[in-house]
Amino acid sequence: MYIIAGLGNPGKEYMGTRHNAGFSVIDELADKYNISVDTAKHKGLIGKGVIAGQKVILVKPMTYMNNSGECIREVMDYYKCDIDDFLVIFDDISLDVGKLRLRAKGSAGGHNGIKSIIAHLGSDKFKRIKFGVGDKPKNWDLADWVLGKFPAEEYATLREANKKACEAVECILTDGIESGMNKYNG
Protein backbone atom coordinates (compact mmCIF):
# COMPACT_ATOMS: atom_id res chain seq x y z
CA MET A 1 0.00 0.00 0.00
CA TYR A 2 1.24 3.47 -0.93
CA ILE A 3 0.47 6.66 0.97
CA ILE A 4 0.36 9.71 -1.29
CA ALA A 5 0.02 13.06 0.46
CA GLY A 6 -0.50 16.48 -1.04
CA LEU A 7 0.31 19.45 1.18
CA GLY A 8 -1.80 22.55 1.63
CA ASN A 9 -3.93 24.50 4.06
CA PRO A 10 -7.57 23.69 4.87
CA GLY A 11 -10.34 26.20 4.26
CA LYS A 12 -11.98 27.85 1.28
CA GLU A 13 -9.82 30.95 1.66
CA TYR A 14 -6.76 28.88 0.71
CA MET A 15 -8.25 27.16 -2.36
CA GLY A 16 -6.31 28.07 -5.48
CA THR A 17 -3.29 29.41 -3.60
CA ARG A 18 0.28 28.52 -4.47
CA HIS A 19 0.73 26.76 -1.12
CA ASN A 20 -2.14 24.39 -1.98
CA ALA A 21 -0.53 22.95 -5.11
CA GLY A 22 -0.24 19.57 -3.36
CA PHE A 23 -3.96 19.53 -2.56
CA SER A 24 -4.70 20.29 -6.24
CA VAL A 25 -2.74 17.26 -7.42
CA ILE A 26 -4.48 15.02 -4.88
CA ASP A 27 -7.83 16.35 -6.13
CA GLU A 28 -6.80 15.60 -9.72
CA LEU A 29 -5.76 12.04 -8.79
CA ALA A 30 -9.00 11.56 -6.85
CA ASP A 31 -11.08 12.69 -9.84
CA LYS A 32 -9.13 10.57 -12.32
CA TYR A 33 -9.36 7.39 -10.23
CA ASN A 34 -12.76 7.92 -8.57
CA ILE A 35 -11.31 8.10 -5.07
CA SER A 36 -13.32 10.08 -2.52
CA VAL A 37 -10.90 11.98 -0.29
CA ASP A 38 -13.51 12.88 2.29
CA THR A 39 -12.95 10.68 5.33
CA ALA A 40 -11.82 12.83 8.27
CA LYS A 41 -9.22 10.73 10.06
CA HIS A 42 -5.74 11.14 11.54
CA LYS A 43 -5.87 14.96 11.38
CA GLY A 44 -6.51 14.86 7.65
CA LEU A 45 -8.86 13.90 4.85
CA ILE A 46 -8.13 10.50 3.37
CA GLY A 47 -9.41 8.32 0.57
CA LYS A 48 -8.59 4.74 -0.39
CA GLY A 49 -8.38 3.44 -3.92
CA VAL A 50 -6.21 1.94 -6.63
CA ILE A 51 -3.82 3.82 -8.94
CA ALA A 52 -1.72 2.03 -11.56
CA GLY A 53 -2.59 -1.32 -10.00
CA GLN A 54 -1.39 -0.25 -6.52
CA LYS A 55 -3.56 0.18 -3.45
CA VAL A 56 -3.19 3.77 -2.32
CA ILE A 57 -4.31 6.11 0.40
CA LEU A 58 -4.59 9.73 -0.71
CA VAL A 59 -4.06 12.22 2.12
CA LYS A 60 -4.71 15.93 2.55
CA PRO A 61 -3.45 16.99 6.00
CA MET A 62 -5.88 19.35 7.75
CA THR A 63 -3.28 20.54 10.27
CA TYR A 64 -2.21 23.58 8.26
CA MET A 65 1.03 23.43 6.34
CA ASN A 66 3.51 23.91 9.18
CA ASN A 67 2.15 20.91 11.12
CA SER A 68 1.69 18.49 8.21
CA GLY A 69 3.97 15.95 9.85
CA GLU A 70 1.44 15.29 12.63
CA CYS A 71 -1.08 13.93 10.13
CA ILE A 72 1.50 12.04 8.09
CA ARG A 73 2.95 10.32 11.17
CA GLU A 74 -0.53 9.22 12.32
CA VAL A 75 -1.45 7.87 8.87
CA MET A 76 1.89 6.07 8.48
CA ASP A 77 1.56 4.49 11.93
CA TYR A 78 -2.08 3.49 11.54
CA TYR A 79 -1.56 1.81 8.17
CA LYS A 80 1.88 0.45 9.15
CA CYS A 81 3.34 2.01 6.03
CA ASP A 82 7.07 1.89 5.39
CA ILE A 83 8.74 5.18 4.48
CA ASP A 84 9.66 3.61 1.10
CA ASP A 85 5.93 3.56 0.29
CA PHE A 86 5.31 7.23 1.05
CA LEU A 87 5.17 10.04 -1.51
CA VAL A 88 4.49 13.73 -0.85
CA ILE A 89 3.55 16.46 -3.33
CA PHE A 90 4.14 20.11 -2.42
CA ASP A 91 4.72 23.62 -3.77
CA ASP A 92 8.22 24.85 -4.58
CA ILE A 93 9.04 28.52 -5.17
CA SER A 94 12.43 27.68 -6.69
CA LEU A 95 10.74 26.16 -9.76
CA ASP A 96 8.92 28.01 -12.51
CA VAL A 97 5.14 27.73 -12.49
CA GLY A 98 4.08 24.24 -13.56
CA LYS A 99 7.55 22.68 -13.55
CA LEU A 100 7.99 19.43 -11.64
CA ARG A 101 11.01 18.05 -9.86
CA LEU A 102 11.01 14.53 -8.43
CA ARG A 103 13.36 13.52 -5.64
CA ALA A 104 13.99 10.26 -3.78
CA LYS A 105 14.98 12.11 -0.59
CA GLY A 106 16.40 15.40 0.60
CA SER A 107 16.27 18.29 3.01
CA ALA A 108 13.27 20.52 3.65
CA GLY A 109 14.81 23.25 1.52
CA GLY A 110 13.08 25.90 3.62
CA HIS A 111 9.60 24.36 3.19
CA ASN A 112 7.91 24.24 6.60
CA GLY A 113 5.51 21.43 5.66
CA ILE A 114 8.39 19.20 4.63
CA LYS A 115 10.35 20.27 7.70
CA SER A 116 7.43 19.07 9.86
CA ILE A 117 7.23 15.73 8.03
CA ILE A 118 10.99 15.16 8.41
CA ALA A 119 10.74 15.96 12.14
CA HIS A 120 7.78 13.61 12.70
CA LEU A 121 9.14 10.74 10.60
CA GLY A 122 12.71 11.17 11.84
CA SER A 123 14.00 10.88 8.28
CA ASP A 124 14.25 12.80 5.02
CA LYS A 125 14.41 9.61 2.96
CA PHE A 126 10.97 9.79 1.36
CA LYS A 127 9.89 10.39 -2.22
CA ARG A 128 8.59 13.76 -3.25
CA ILE A 129 7.21 15.68 -6.19
CA LYS A 130 7.98 19.38 -6.06
CA PHE A 131 5.40 21.45 -7.94
CA GLY A 132 6.71 24.77 -9.24
CA VAL A 133 4.75 27.85 -8.20
CA GLY A 134 7.31 30.47 -9.22
CA ASP A 135 9.59 32.65 -7.13
CA LYS A 136 8.19 35.60 -5.24
CA PRO A 137 8.69 39.00 -6.81
CA LYS A 138 11.27 41.27 -5.24
CA ASN A 139 9.91 43.16 -2.19
CA TRP A 140 7.11 40.62 -1.65
CA ASP A 141 6.71 38.84 1.67
CA LEU A 142 7.12 35.07 1.20
CA ALA A 143 3.93 34.25 3.16
CA ASP A 144 1.92 36.70 1.05
CA TRP A 145 3.30 35.10 -2.11
CA VAL A 146 2.63 31.44 -1.27
CA LEU A 147 -0.78 32.26 0.22
CA GLY A 148 -1.69 34.27 -2.87
CA LYS A 149 -3.80 32.84 -5.67
CA PHE A 150 -2.48 32.05 -9.12
CA PRO A 151 -3.38 34.64 -11.75
CA ALA A 152 -5.88 33.58 -14.44
CA GLU A 153 -3.22 33.60 -17.16
CA GLU A 154 -1.45 30.70 -15.40
CA TYR A 155 -4.52 28.43 -15.20
CA ALA A 156 -3.80 26.54 -18.44
CA THR A 157 -0.21 25.90 -17.33
CA LEU A 158 -1.47 24.67 -13.95
CA ARG A 159 -4.02 22.30 -15.51
CA GLU A 160 -1.28 20.74 -17.64
CA ALA A 161 1.08 20.55 -14.65
CA ASN A 162 -1.59 18.80 -12.55
CA LYS A 163 -2.03 16.20 -15.30
CA LYS A 164 1.73 15.79 -15.61
CA ALA A 165 2.04 15.39 -11.81
CA CYS A 166 -0.59 12.62 -11.93
CA GLU A 167 1.41 10.89 -14.67
CA ALA A 168 4.53 11.23 -12.52
CA VAL A 169 2.72 9.57 -9.60
CA GLU A 170 1.65 6.72 -11.88
CA CYS A 171 5.23 6.36 -13.14
CA ILE A 172 6.60 6.22 -9.58
CA LEU A 173 4.05 3.55 -8.64
CA THR A 174 4.76 1.37 -11.68
CA ASP A 175 8.43 1.99 -12.51
CA GLY A 176 9.98 3.58 -9.40
CA ILE A 177 11.30 6.99 -8.44
CA GLU A 178 14.47 6.76 -10.57
CA SER A 179 12.41 6.23 -13.71
CA GLY A 180 10.15 9.10 -12.68
CA MET A 181 13.10 11.41 -12.13
CA ASN A 182 14.55 10.52 -15.55
CA LYS A 183 11.23 11.16 -17.26
CA TYR A 184 9.87 14.23 -15.45
CA ASN A 185 12.86 16.24 -14.21
CA GLY A 186 13.45 18.67 -17.04
Curated annotation (Swiss-Prot):
Active site: H19
Keyword annotations of the record: Cytoplasm, Hydrolase, RNA-binding, tRNA-binding
Residues annotated as binding tRNA: Y14, Y64, N66, N112
A GO BP entry: rescue of stalled ribosome
Record-linked Gene3D superfamilies: Peptidyl-tRNA hydrolase
Ranges in a coiled coil: none
Assembly and oligomerization: Monomer.
Record-stated family: Belongs to the PTH family.
Annotated function: Hydrolyzes ribosome-free peptidyl-tRNAs (with 1 or more amino acids incorporated), which drop off the ribosome during protein synthesis, or as a result of ribosome stalling. Catalyzes the release of premature peptidyl moieties from peptidyl-tRNA molecules trapped in stalled 50S ribosomal subunits, and thus maintains levels of free tRNAs and 50S ribosomes.
Record-given protein name: Peptidyl-tRNA hydrolase
